[in-house]
Structure formats: C-alpha cells, structure tokens
C-alpha cells in the first residue's frame, strides 16, 4: 500500500494545547497493544514506568468504553516513541494505522461501510462518541476525494494530527482505496483556525 502525507500549511509554527479534553479508552488500548505486538511485554512495562504516576494510573487498565484525558494520551504516545527509539511523527502515523486496523476489526467493526464516503459522513456525525472536544464535518469532493474539517477543538497537538493522518490512510485502505494521499491544508498547530485534511485515493 502506498501512502503519501504532506503538510501544506502556511506557517512552520507548531504549537499544542493538551488540557481539558478526553478521548475514548479504545485509543489508549490500541496504542498499548501496538507496543506489545511490535516490541513485546517488556516494552509495555518500560513505557508505563516512564509515565508520570497520575498518567500511569489513568492509562493502565483503561477500558475501551471509558474516557482518558487527551493530555495523558499524548504523554503516553511520547513515552512510546522514547522507549521504542522512534521518531515521534513517524511513530504517530504508524499508531494511527494500527488503531484503524484494530478498532475497525473489533469494537467498531459495525461502523464499516461499503462506501467510504458514507463511512466518513457517519464518522463525522459520531465524532463526540470518541472525543469530547471539537466538531468534525465531512465533504465529498469527488468519487475519490474528500475533505475533513475539524472545528473548535480546544485540544490539539502535532502528534495527534500525525496519528489522525495515519488513521485516515488506513481507513481508506481498509475500504479498498489505493495510492492514498492525505494533505493537511490547515492546522490549529500552525495557528490556523481549523484543521483541514484533504483526502485522495484511487
């Protein structure tokens, strides 16, 4: 599978806001499972041990249906990158791929659709079931193009955008798309008002 990811933003400023938001525990569980599957149980133990105590208490044993703070998720992901010796951006994309594979084959398999545009439209409508900040809207641009806009997100991070890119790439591939390209044409991390993901596949 070929993936292409380009950030097409007008500023090199990369900022983040971590406090106040929550994500579903299924995301945390998928990221820990990624470490276990790729690097083994010892790497999971080292990752959890590298976290601040309050983050460890939140992510260790989290349920798929429960909520985890956005800040704890980002701290977990950065601990994974350090422990596994990976560059953060590349690892976040890979975590996004893995999360899509795991969640769409298990707890969220009922959300899969024959039509990828239908999946993204439904996903935008269900946004608040997976994170409690921001709103998402989906626009079908052509049979093989789409656009996702994320508005009013009080929490954001370059790491999360990279993970979202990987997730979108894998979702499109799971639904049969080839030669997937994701372009982030605007981003709150670069002082833009919204995050915009341009999707293209064959």
Q: Which residues are covered by each model-predicted region?
A:
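Short terminal or interdomain "cap/linker" segment that borders an active site or interface and mediates
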Residues: 2, 8-32, 128-165, 172-202
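Long, highly charged amphipathic alpha-helices
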Residues: 30, 46, 75, 122, ...
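Amphipathic interaction/junction segments at domain boundaries or subunit interfaces
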Residues: 4, 62-163, 186
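N-terminal low-complexity or simple alpha-helical regulatory segments
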Residues: 2-104
């Amino acid at each position: 599978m070929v993936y292409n990811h380009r950030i097409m933003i007008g500023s090199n400023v990369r900022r983040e806001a971590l406090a106040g938001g929550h994500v579903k525990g299924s995301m945390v569980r998928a990221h820990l499972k990624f470490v276990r599957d790729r690097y083994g149980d010892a790497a999971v133990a080292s990752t959890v041990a590298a976290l601040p105590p309050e983050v460890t208490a939140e992510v260790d044993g989290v349920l798929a249906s429960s909520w985890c703070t956005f800040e704890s998720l980002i701290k977990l992901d950065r601990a994974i990158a350090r422990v596994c010796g990976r560059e953060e951006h590349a690892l976040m994309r890979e975590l996004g791929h893995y999360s899509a594979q795991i969640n769409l084959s298990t707890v969220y398999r009922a959300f899969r659709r024959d039509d990828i545009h239908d999946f993204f439209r439904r996903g935008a409508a269900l946004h608040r079931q997976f994170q409690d900040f921001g709103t998402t809207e989906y626009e079908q641009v052509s049979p093989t193009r789409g656009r996702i806009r994320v508005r009013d997100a009080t929490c954001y991070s370059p790491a999360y955008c990279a993970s979202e890119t990987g997730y979108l790439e894998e979702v499109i591939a799971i639904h049969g798309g080839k030669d997937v390209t994701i372009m982030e044409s605007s981003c709150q991390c670069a002082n833009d008002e919204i995050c915009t993901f341009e999707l293209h596949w064959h």
